[in-house]
Amino acid sequence: MKRTYQPSKLRRARKHGFRNRMSTKNGRRVLAARRRKGRKVLAA
């Protein structure tokens, strides 16, 4: 059986990357929350 996680850097960046987060209001909310929490990494 094929495993469900088949990593792809491009797909990861497009779905969860910084520029994608910045492109929507809710995405910016995610980044703000992660900054508030003090996350070292904000986006993929």
Curated annotation (Swiss-Prot):
Ranges where the record places region Disordered: 1-44
One annotated GO biological process: translation
Keyword terms: Ribonucleoprotein, Ribosomal protein
Pfam families: Ribosomal_L34
A GO CC annotation given for this chain: ribosome
Record-linked InterPro entries: Ribosomal_bL34, Ribosomal_bL34_CS
Entry annotated with the keyword Ribosomal protein: yes
Molecular functions per Gene Ontology: structural constituent of ribosome
Compositional bias of kind Basic residues: 1-19, 26-44
Family: Belongs to the bacterial ribosomal protein bL34 family.
NCBIfam families: rpmH_bact
Annotated protein name in UniProt: Large ribosomal subunit protein bL34
Species assigned in the record: Streptococcus pneumoniae serotype 4 (strain ATCC BAA-334 / TIGR4)
Gene this chain is encoded by: rpmH
